[in-house]
Design a protein with these regions (language model features):
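Conserved catalytic/ligand-binding micro-motifs in nucleotide and anionic cofactor chemistry
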Residues: 1-247, 251-361, 379, 385-518
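A cross-taxon signal for low-complexity, glycine/charged-rich
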Residues: 365-367, 371-378, 382
Length: 518
C-alpha cells in the first residue's frame, strides 16, 4: 500500500501575521491546500504556477471598505476568515504538479472524486481476444486484469485507435464482426468475406471457409504484429521479396516491395508508446524543484511508469554530465568543444546517514526528505524504508542513473487496483500526447532487450536540468564599418586598400627623454 499523503510544508495561518507567512512561501509552481479549523472538513485544493501570488489573492485582506470600516462584498473568492492551516509543496514542472494534485485529491476526497476533479478517463486501447475461439480486434477503454496481456496502447483517442486497427486488419484476414460466432456451413457471412478480406470462420464446415487451426494461426500473426509493432510482418514480407529477387522474378519482387511499404505505413500509424499494456514501461524526465540552498537546479526529476504505477519524483544529479550535454549539442570535436577540456567535479557530497527512527522514502532522496515538515514525506508510491539510498553512494553518472531507476522500481512491485491503474495510465497518456511544443520534459522507453538506455537518459537529464547550450553570438560584421579607416598605398593599382585605425593607447606617464637620464 502507498504511504499516506502529506505535503512538504504546513503552517498555521493567522490574519495578523499573514504578510510574513505569505512572504515565506516561494513564488514558484506547486500544489497547496487550505484547511479550516475542523480537520474533518474538505480542504480547498488546487495547483498554481505561482504559489505566493495565488495565496495572496485568496488570503489578502479586502481592498475596499465602507464608511463603517467593514469590507465591501466582492465577487472575488476570499478565504481569509475561514482558513486556519496552509499546506503546500513546491514542484518543478507541470507534470509533477498534476501528479501531486492527483495524489492529494485522492487522499482528501477519495479516488472517485479525484478522478472527477481531474477529468481522468481510461485511455483507448486495442484488444485482440486471443482467449476466445474466434479472436477479433476492437477498440475499448474498459480494462481488466484478464485483458491486460491482450491489450495494446494507449492511444490518444478512439478515432486514432480505430484508424490503426483498420490499417492493420487490411493486412490480414481476421474477422471484423462483433457477434459471438456460432459457426455452421450455411452461415450467410458478411461483406468482408465476399471481398476476400476475411477467412469466414462463421462458415466452419463449408469448403470455402477456413479450419479452426488456420484461423488460430492467422490470429497469432496479428497478435505478433501488435507485439512487435509490425516488425514480424515486415521481416516476413522482406524475406519473400528477397527470395523472389534471387529467383529472378522481379515482378513478384516489385509487388512484394509495395506490400512491404504498405505494412510499413500501417506500422507507423502507432506511436512509440503503443506497447502491450501489461509490459508498458516509460521513464519521464522533468525539471526538478530546486532545493532551499540551491540557486540553480543541477538535477532532473525522474518519474517511472511500470506495472501500472506512476511513481516519483526521484532526483538525478547532473554532476559530471556537463560534457555529455555539450557533446550532444554540437558534436565531440575538441575544437568545437573547448569546455570538454575543463575539469569537472566527479565527487558528490557525503551521503546523509538516516537514523532508524527517521524513515525516508528512496523515491524522494535525502535532499527533499530533509525539507519535509511533518511525520510523513510527500506521497511516494511505496512503503517507507530506513535504509540509505544507494543512489547517493554512487560516484559515476551511470551508477546514479541506475540507482535512481532501481529506487523507483522498488515501489512498482505490487500491482495496483484497476481503477488506479487506469488513472496513472490516463495521466501518462495526457502528458505524452500533448503537442511537442507544449510537452515539457523527455520520455524514454526500454530497448527491445528490456534494458534502459542509460547514456541517452543522462543526456536527456542534462538537457532538462541545464537547458540547451547557449547559442554562439553571431559575428558583428557591421561593427568594423564604424571604425576610423585609412587608405594606404593610395593611387597604386592592385595595392591600394582601406584598413581600420586602431585606437591610440592612453599615455599613463610622461615620456622620458635622453636628457632626463643624464
Amino acid at each position: 500500500m502507498a504511504a499516506p499523503f502529506a505535503f512538504e510544508h504546513r503552517a498555521e495561518f493567522l490574519p495578523e501575521s499573514s504578510d510574513d507567512l505569505l512572504r515565506s512561501i516561494p513564488a514558484a509552481p506547486g500544489v497547496f491546500a487550505l484547511r479550516g479549523a475542523d480537520p474533518a472538513a474538505e480542504p480547498y485544493l488546487t495547483r498554481a504556477a505561482d504559489l505566493r501570488r495565488r495565496l495572496r489573492r485568496l488570503l489578502a485582506p479586502p481592498e475596499a471598505l465602507d464608511e463603517n470600516g467593514q469590507p465591501v462584498p466582492s465577487k472575488r473568492l476570499n478565504l481569509r476568515a475561514r482558513i486556519h492551516w496552509i499546506e503546500w509543496t513546491r514542484t518543478g514542472s507541470d507534470f509533477e504538479s498534476t501528479l501531486l494534485l492527483y495524489r492529494a485529491a485522492r487522499s482528501a476526497f477519495g479516488p472517485d472524486e479525484a478522478r472527477r476533479r481531474l477529468r481522468l478517463h481510461a485511455p483507448y486501447v486495442l484488444r485482440i481476444t486471443m482467449s476466445q475461439p474466434h479472436p477479433r480486434v476492437y477498440s475499448t477503454n474498459r480494462l481488466s486484469k484478464k485483458s491486460l496481456r491482450e491489450s495494446f496502447g494507449p492511444f490518444p483517442s478512439r478515432a486514432t485507435a480505430e484508424r490503426y486497427c483498420d490499417a492493420v486488419l487490411d493486412l490480414f484476414l481476421l474477422r471484423r464482426c462483433y457477434e459471438d460466432l456460432e459457426p455452421y456451413p450455411e452461415h450467410p457471412g458478411c461483406v468482408y468475406g465476399e471481398m476476400n478480406k476475411c477467412m469466414q470462420p462463421c462458415k466452419e464446415g463449408n469448403p470455402q471457409a477456413c479450419t479452426p487451426e488456420q484461423y488460430a494461426r492467422e490470429a497469432q500473426r496479428v497478435f505478433d504484429f501488435f507485439l512487435t509493432r509490425g516488425q514480424s510482418l515486415l521481416d516476413e514480407v522482406a524475406a519473400q521479396r528477397d527470395a523472389a529477387s534471387e529467383a529472378m522474378d522481379f515482378e513478384a519482387a516489385a509487388a512484394l516491395h509495395k506490400q512491404w511499404e504498405k505494412v510499413r505505413a500501417a506500422s507507423l500509424q502507432a506511436d512509440e508508446l503503443v506497447r502491450p499494456i501489461d509490459q508498458l514501461r516509460a521513464l519521464i524526465l522533468q525539471e526538478a524543484a530546486p532545493l532551499e540552498d540551491e540557486t540553480r537546479p543541477e538535477a532532473a526529476a525522474v518519474f517511472l511508469f511500470q506495472h501500472g504505477h506512476l511513481c516519483g519524483p526521484q532526483r538525478l544529479s547532473t554532476l559530471g554530465v556537463r560534457a555529455v550535454r555539450e557533446q550532444t549539442a554540437v558534436g565531440s570535436s575538441l575544437f568545437a568543444q573547448p569546455l570538454m577540456l575543463a575539469p569537472i567535479p566527479l565527487n558528490e557530497p557525503a551521503p546523509i546517514q538516516i537514523a532508524q527512527n527517521n524513515p525516508v522514502i528512496l523515491s524522494e532522496g535525502p535532499e527533499r526528505a530533509g525539507r519535509v515538515e511533518g511525520p510523513q514525506p510527500k506521497n511516494p508510491e511505496g512503503p517507507p524504508t530506513t535504509q540509505t539510498a544507494p543512489s547517493f553512494l554512487a560516484t559515476t553518472p551511470e551508477d546514479r542513473a541506475r540507482a535512481a531507476i532501481d529506487a523507483l522500481a522498488m515501489h512498482t512491485e505490487s500491482a495496483p487496483d484497476m481503477a488506479e491503474f487506469c488513472d496513472h495510465l490516463s495521466l501518462l497518456r495526457r502528458w505524452y500526447y500533448r503537442p511537442e511544443k507544449q510537452r515539457a520534459g523527455e520520455v524514454f522507453l526500454p530497448t527491445p532487450d528490456g534494458a534502459w538506455p542509460i547514456r541517452r537518459i543522462l543526456n536527456g537529464a542534462a538537457r532538462v536540468a541545464l537547458g540547451p547550450p547557449a547559442p554562439i553570438s553571431p559575428a558583428d560584421r557591421e561593427a568594423a564599418k564604424a571604425l576610423k579607416t585609412r587608405i594606404i598605398h593610395a593611387g597604386r593599382e592592385g595595392v591600394e586598400r582601406e584598413v581600420p585605425l586602431l585606437p591610440k593607447r592612453p599615455r599613463t606617464r610622461k615620456a622620458v627623454t635622453p636628457d632626463d637620464l643624464v
